[in-house]
From Swiss-Prot:
Functional summary from the UniProt entry: Protein S19 forms a complex with S13 that binds strongly to the 16S ribosomal RNA.
Keywords per UniProt: Ribonucleoprotein, Ribosomal protein, RNA-binding, rRNA-binding
GO CC field: cytoplasm; small ribosomal subunit
Species assigned in the record: Chlamydia trachomatis serovar D (strain ATCC VR-885 / DSM 19411 / UW-3/Cx)
Keyword Coiled coil appears in the UniProt entry: no
Protein name: Small ribosomal subunit protein uS19
Gene3D superfamilies for this protein: 30s Ribosomal Protein S19, Chain A
Length: 88
């Protein structure tokens, strides 16, 4: 079930504050976050985030096509290693 339109997108307050502060100072340093649930908003375009995937931080550069998605969608948590090939 999707989120109600009257509520608007969810973005953690601390993350939104960091983005707004960096926009005011016109800085583009990477923002480290554990908030995979936060929605990408238009004011985040052009910023680089380091999103935690449970083990390490993966770098995500936000572009216009990512608006409306969540940060966690671009930081996969499961890595599939192929099944071994039987020799013989």
């Amino acid at each position: 079930m999707s989120r109600s339109l009257r509520k608007g997108p969810f973005v953690d307050h601390h993350l939104l504050k960091k983005v707004r502060d960096m926009n005011a100072l016109e800085k583009k340093t990477p923002i480290k976050t554990w908030s995979r649930r936060s929605m990408i908003t238009p004011e985040m375009i052009g910023h680089t985030f380091e999103v935690h995937n449970g083990r390490k931080f993966l770098t995500v550069f936000v572009s216009e096509t990512m608006v409306g998605h969540k940060l966690g969608e671009f930081s996969p948590t499961r890595m599939f290693k192929s099944h071994p090939v039987k020799k013989g």
